[in-house]
Curated annotation (Swiss-Prot):
Residues 21-26 are annotated as: Involved in allosteric activation by GTP. InterPro entries: AceGlu_kinase-like_sf (IPR036393), Asp/Glu/Uridylate_kinase (IPR001048), Uridylate_kinase (IPR011817), Uridylate_kinase_bac (IPR015963). It is found in: Cytoplasm. Allosterically activated by GTP. Inhibited by UTP. Pathway: Pyrimidine metabolism; CTP biosynthesis via de novo pathway; UDP from UMP (UMPK route): step 1/1. It catalyses: UMP + ATP = UDP + ADP. This is Uridylate kinase. The keyword Kinase applies. ATP binds at K13, A14, S15, G16, G56, R60, T163, Q164, Y169, D172. One of its GO terms (biological process) is UDP biosynthetic process. Pfam families: AA_kinase. Its EC number is 2.7.4.22. Belongs to the UMP kinase family.
């Protein structure tokens, strides 16, 4: 790819639902391999990549709470689901000979390294893809919030939020054909309009740290790398 990237260090947020593909549950290895291929292309362009994966394809803590269960326990189960997804994506990356490390917010030394900013920056300096697992390590915080937090800690120039659609819309375009697509928004506009991009805490944290959010379709092959070079189709959230 001849075009030069406009970002040198980014955080990719991929939902657990994206990893399950057309399946109703679990991990579609072909999808994990495709996402890994996009990340590998970004690395070939010299872009440093951190990744946060959700766990909704396996478990959601809020589902427990909605049925009368303990939200804290449910969130802990959801955090463990993100570790499974992180290991799956790491496996797909290693099949492509991409040096990858999984850092977990929950200590589990026999499975992966524990998260710290120092470890993150060290692994990035060695050219490794860093996958962050375990969310923030705290209940009541989403993996979107974890993405914004890790992006700030690693000094990311942008958060790339891979979604089911090609940007931010005024409503769910799959349910409302009249939904309007936005090409560009500010963080404040996202919050004021109540747009379902990331949760309020995540958008606010990104705004406070002047980190743009790039929303694109995770299902578009090469979409991630095209946007890295200024092409592709996405909505950019920035105050600059």
């Amino acid at each position: 790819m001849s075009a030069q990237p406009i970002y040198k260090r980014v955080l990719l947020k991929a939902s657990g639902e994206a990893l399950m593909g057309s399946q109703g549950f679990g991990i579609d290895v072909a999808v994990a391999d495709r996402i890994a291929s996009d990340i590998a292309q970004a690395r070939a362009m010299g872009v440093e990549v951190g990744v946060v994966v959700g766990g909704g394809n396996i478990f959601r803590g809020v589902a427990v709470a909605s049925k009368g269960g303990d939200r804290v326990t449910g969130d802990h189960m959801g955090m463990l689901a993100t570790v499974i997804n992180a290991l799956a994506l790491a496996t797909s990356l290693r099949k492509l000979d991409i040096d990858t490390v999984v850092l977990s917010a929950i200590a589990m030394p026999e499975i992966c390294e524990s998260f710290s900013q120092r470890a993150t920056l060290y692994h990035l300096s060695l050219g490794r893809v860093v996958i962050f697992a375990g969310g923030t390590g705290n209940p009541f915080f989403t993996t979107d919030s974890a993405a914004a937090l890790r992006a700030a800690e690693m000094g990311a120039e942008a958060i790339f939020k891979g979604t089911q659609v090609d940007g931010i819309y005024s409503a769910d375009p799959k349910k409302d054909p009249s939904a309007t697509r936005f090409d560009r928004l500010t963080h404040s506009e996202v919050l004021e309009k109540g747009l379902a991009v990331m949760d309020v805490a995540a958008v606010a944290l990104a705004r406070e740290n002047a980190i743009p959010i790039v929303v694109f379709s995770i299902h578009e092959k090469d979409g991630f790398t095209e946007i890295l070079t200024g092409g592709g189709r996405a909505t950019i959230v920035t105050d600059s």
